[in-house]
Each structure stands twice: as C-alpha cells, then as structure tokens.
C-alpha cells in the first residue's frame, strides 16, 4: 500500500533506529478510504491513528498522508494522553484517503500474571477511597461509560473467577479464558452499537464486544479496566502465503493491578498481552478511541475500505 505521490505533510518524520534488545520491530501501514455518494461540502474528522508511547512500546517513526489535503489540521493529546489529529475539509470531495505508516518497537518482556498478586478485593477497596495516586488515576476507568453499562448480570458472570482473596492477575486471566472458551467470534452477530448485555446473552461478537464485556464485568465488581485499541500481528497457517493488507485492527483491555501496574488481556484470543499487540490508544470504551469519527455534510451514503499491514 504505497503512500500517495504527493502526501499531506506528515505529523512526524524520523529515521528508523535499530530495535532494542528484547523488542520486536514492526512497520505498520493502515489505509482508510471513504467513498461518498455525493460531494461532501464540509467535513470534520477526529483521528486516533497515531500510536502512543508506553513503557513497553517505542515509536521510532510516523507518517500520515491525507488526500485531498485538509483545510485545517491540528494535533494534540486527549484527556487520556492519546495523540489525536483533528481535520476540517472545506473543499467538495467524493473520496477521502487517510494513510499512515508506523515504525515501532514492542518489548517482548511483559508483566507476568504471577507477579500481580494483590487480592482483587483490596484493589476494589482502594478504588472506593482512592487516596493514592495510582488509585486516583485508575478510578477514571472504574465506572460505567457510554458503551460499557454495568449491572448484576455482569457481576454474576464475573464472580466465579473472582473467589475470595484470589490474586487480581489470576482472577482476571481466568475471566479472559472463560470469555474465549464460552463465546463465539461472529462478525455478523453485532454492530458497533450492540449493548454489552446483549453480547452476554447471545455469547457472540467480535473483539470490540469481548473487550467491552470483560471491562463491564470487571467494573461491575468495582475494579478498574480500560479499553485498548491497536493492531494484532497475524501469522498465516503453514504453507499459506501472507496476504498484504489482511492484518487487522484489534481491541483488548487492561485491568488495574495496583499502583501504576496494568495487565493487558485479550479475551478474543484467550491470552495475556504479548509483543503481537501494538497499542494505538486507550480510553473508557471504543467511543473514546475510535480510529476515525466526525461529521460530514453533503451525502448520506458512504463506504469505508480499510486495509492494515503489520510487517514484523
């Protein structure tokens, strides 16, 4: 997926550096093409396509191209510290192309579940009275949000994993495994607006649904969990050629384990975080970190084509 011959000015240019010891180096290409039924006369877009730096992730290069070039483009960080780009398009257009290219290093060493030994009830109690800095920061992610409703059914679903005194890492991973084992990945079963309660009842959905479900279950117990958007490196079966553009955007979650410690969990695949996961942004739910959202004037018809290539 080559970038346009005359791309819009990149957010940042940097020469890729050698990967650190114990890190996997990736180049990620993300292409979004919007096709409209009529001319768009005015458009506002908010993009979460710029990866954030984390303790386990180092961004060594980032380029963004936009065609047609925006009339206004500004860059800043949102409430959660995620980089975001705001665009205004003032000229008529029937197609919008947004392409990014990311050079990034992801550490292979991750926090071990066995080290997350604080009993889950202790963390719940800390969040009830968040006097420590870590608890105060985490408390943002302990309550219901627009796309994550809480309730008794979700609490009841989580409780078999959260027996009395069980360490947070062990309990949260058990819940991750249960979602993976008991639910079916089905891209036709849900939409972006499907409530968490419906996902729990039907036991079908996609990565976004399963992340929201586990977040809702954890918060219903009084724990803190945040939604993470990013990319997943996929490996084709033996003997099968790798298809360029066939990698995927992905969603998972992080549960707060005390102080400044968070544990990534991927219920879609039933495993903890690994170097196969590349973080873009995190927030309370998908609505905080949607790759692209906004308002257009001029057409009620649009098609979106997305291609992702994770080369590691």
Summary of predicted features, one role per range:
Residues 76, 116, 181, 188-196, ...:
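Glycine-rich, flexible loop/turn motifs
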Residues 119-205, 221, 284-286, 298-301, ...:
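Secondary-structure boundary elements
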Residues 21, 200-204, 242:
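Alpha-helix N-cap/helix-initiation motif
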Residues 35, 157, 161, 195-199, ...:
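Short, hydrophobic/aromatic alpha-helical segments in well-folded domains
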Residues 3-4, 177, 209-298:
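Hydrophobic/aromatic-rich core segments of domains that either
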Residues 47-57, 62-65, 269-290, 294-303, ...:
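Glycine-rich, small/acidic residue-mixed loop/short-helix segments
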């Amino acid at each position: 997926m080559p970038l346009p011959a005359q791309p819009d000015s990149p957010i940042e240019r940097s020469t890729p550096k050698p990967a650190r010891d114990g890190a996997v180096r990736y180049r990620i290409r993300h292409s979004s093409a919007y096709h409209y039924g009529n001319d768009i006369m005015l458009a506002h877009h908010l993009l979460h396509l710029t990866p954030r730096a984390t303790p386990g992730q180092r961004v060594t290069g980032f380029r963004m191209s936009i065609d047609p070039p925006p009339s206004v483009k500004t860059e800043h960080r949102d409430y959660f510290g995620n980089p975001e780009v705001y665009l205004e398009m003032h000229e008529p257009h029937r197609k919008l192309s947004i392409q990014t290219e990311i050079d990034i290093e992801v550490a292979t060493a991750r926090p071990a579940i066995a080290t997350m030994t604080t009993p889950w009830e202790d963390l719940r109690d800390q969040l009830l009275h968040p006097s420590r800095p870590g608890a105060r920061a985490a408390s943002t992610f302990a309550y219901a949000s627009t796309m994550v409703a809480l309730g008794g059914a979700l609490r009841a679903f989580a409780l078999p994993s959260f027996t009395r005194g069980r360490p947070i890492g062990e309990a949260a991973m058990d819940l991750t495994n249960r979602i993976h084992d008991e639910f079916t990945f089905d891209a036709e079963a849900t939409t972006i607006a499907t409530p968490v309660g419906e996902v729990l009842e039907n036991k079908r959905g996609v990565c976004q649904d399963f992340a929201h479900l586990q977040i809702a279950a954890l918060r219903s117990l009084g724990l803190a969990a945040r939604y993470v958007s990013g990319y997943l490196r996929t490996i084709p079966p033996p003997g099968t050629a790798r298809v360029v553009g066939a990698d995927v955007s992905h969603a998972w979650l992080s549960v707060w384990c005390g102080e400044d410690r968070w544990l990534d969990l991927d219920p879609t695949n039933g495993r903890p975080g690994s170097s196969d996961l590349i973080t873009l942004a995190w927030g309370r739910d998908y609505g905080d970190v949607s790759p692209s959202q906004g308002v257009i004037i001029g057409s009620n018809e649009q098609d979106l084509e997305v291609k992702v290539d994770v080369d590691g």
